[in-house]
From Swiss-Prot:
Residues 1-30, 92-121, 174-236 are annotated as: Disordered. Changing residue 338 to H: In OZEMA15; uncertain significance. Contrary to other WD repeat Groucho/TLE family members, does not contain any identifiable Q, GP, CcN or SP domains. Only the C-terminal WD-repeat domain is conserved. This is Transducin-like enhancer protein 6. The modification Phosphoserine is found at residue 510. Gene3D superfamilies: YVTN repeat-like/Quinoprotein amine dehydrogenase. Component of the subcortical maternal complex (SCMC), a multiprotein complex that plays a key role in early embryonic development. The SCMC complex is a structural constituent of cytoplasmic lattices, which consist in fibrous structures found in the cytoplasm of oocytes and preimplantation embryos. They are required to store maternal proteins critical for embryonic development, such as proteins that control epigenetic reprogramming of the preimplantation embryo, and prevent their degradation or activation. It comes from Homo sapiens (Human).
Amino acid sequence: MTSRDQPRPKGPPKSTSPCPGISNSESSPTLNYQGILNRLKQFPRFSPHFAAELESIYYSLHKIQQDVAEHHKQIGNVLQIVESCSQLQGFQSEEVSPAEPASPGTPQQVKDKTLQESSFEDIMATRSSDWLRRPLGEDNQPETQLFWDKEPWFWHDTLTEQLWRIFAGVHDEKAKPRDRQQAPGLGQESKAPGSCDPGTDPCPEDASTPRPPEASSSPPEGSQDRNTSWGVVQEPPGRASRFLQSISWDPEDFEDAWKRPDALPGQSKRLAVPCKLEKMRILAHGELVLATAISSFTRHVFTCGRRGIKVWSLTGQVAEDRFPESHLPIQTPGAFLRTCLLSSNSRSLLTGGYNLASVSVWDLAAPSLHVKEQLPCAGLNCQALDANLDANLAFASFTSGVVRIWDLRDQSVVRDLKGYPDGVKSIVVKGYNIWTGGPDACLRCWDQRTIMKPLEYQFKSQIMSLSHSPQEDWVLLGMANGQQWLQSTSGSQRHMVGQKDSVILSVKFSPFGQWWASVGMDDFLGVYSMPAGTKVFEVPEMSPVTCCDVSSNNRLVVTGSGEHASVYQITY
C-alpha cells in the first residue's frame, strides 16, 4: 500500500539487480544503502542511534565482502602455482639434455632475465623445476635450498594454509631419496681414542664429523649393517610428523578412563591399565642401547651404550632427537658400560660395566654432571645394579657370581655374596631381601639380616630379567624361553603369567604395580595386566628391544631398540 503524499528519495539508484543486496558494481551497494537509509529517515520516530547502528553494520558487511573477494583471489593464485608446476613436469622431456650441446643463445637469455622481469609464478615455477631435475649428487650446492619461507605471505586463513601444505607435500615426497643419503649424527661430542670397545670390534669413527665414504676404518660388513639399521630407524619426513608434539606433563591434559562420564564409580587411576601408547620421541643414541632410564621429575631420559651415557631432555618438541643434552663418555681405555640405574629420587645415576675399577655414581642435582662417588669393584665385571636409598645401600651383580653391597655414605664394601657358578645376570632388592637370577635358571633370595644360605627356586630356563611389584609380594621373572613367571616373596607359590614368542630381555613393573612392560627378541613392547598376566596390547618396534623403563609418574615408557630409544606416552 502506497501514498502519493509520502516523500520519495532524492535520487533513485542508478542500477538495479534482480536479487536484493547483490550488485555487479562496487558503487551500487553504497547507493542502495543510502537510498534505504534516506527512506528510513523520513519516518518521524527514526532514531539517530539506530542510524549509527545501521552504518556500522553496513561497513562490517562491506569489509566481509572485501575479505571474501581477497580469499578467492588467494586461492586462485595457489591453484595457478600448482597448475604451473604440474605442467612443467610434462615439459621436462622437451628440454635440452646434459649430453646435447645447448645453443649459444640459450644461456644468455637466462642470464639476462632479471627478477624484476619475472612474475611471482614464473619464479616459483623456474626454481621448482630446477630443484626437481637436480641430481642427488648436487645437494651441496646453494641452489638446492628450498625456496619458500616458513610463513609465506599468503598464509591468512586455514583453508589457504592447508592448500599450501598440500602443495609443499609434493616436494617432501620428492625429497625423500635425498634425505636418506644424509648420514645421521651421533651427538655433539667426539669420542676419545681410549673409549673404543674391547674385543674384535674396531673403534667406529665419530659420525658427527664429515668424512668421505672410503675413509671409514670399519669393515665393509659393519658399515653396511650400520647404514641399514639407520635406514630402519629413520622415518620419512612425512611420517615423522605424526608424533611431532610436546610430551604432556599436566594430568588435566589426559583423557583417562576414570575421567569419562561412563566410568565406574570405583574406578581409580591406581587400578587402571594402559589403553594406548603413543610414540612421542625417537632418541638416536648412535650405538646399541644396552640400558635405559627415565625421570619424570627432571624430565630426562638416560640411554646407556658401550661407550658412555647420553642424557636427553624431554621438554623440547622434536620427532627424532640426534643431539643429547649431555654425554658421559667412558674415560678408561679398554672398558665399556653394561648397565645404568636411576635412583628412586632421580638425584643420582649409577653406571657399571666391564674392565672398570668402580661403579660410578653421577650427581644429577649439581649444576654440572660429575661423579660424586666411586664404589670399588676392581677385577669385577658388572651386570646389573640396584639401590636402597632408605638404607643408603647400593647393590651390584657380576659375571663372576659375586653380589656386592656398598654403603653409600662412605663407599665401603658392606658384604660380598657368593655362590653363583655361572654368574648373576639380574638383581632386584625389596625390603631386606635380595633377589637374583642368572644362566643357571635358579632364582635365589638372600636375607641381608642373616648370614644363612639363600632360598632357591629352580626354573627350567635362564632368568634374563627381574622386577618386583611395588605394592604386592611378587617378583616378576622374564625367561629365555619367552615365559613370564610371578614368584611369591612370602612363600613358594608361583604361576606363569603369559609367554612371548622369543627371548625376554627386560621386564618392568609400573609404579602402582597394576601392569608391567615386557620386551625381548620378538620386536614388540608388550603390556600385561596383574594378576593373571593378561596381554593388554603390543607395540611393534623395528628391531629387537633390549631394555625398557617406566617413569615414576606412570605416564611414560622408554625402550631401547637397536641404536635408538623410543619414548611413549601412556593413556589410561
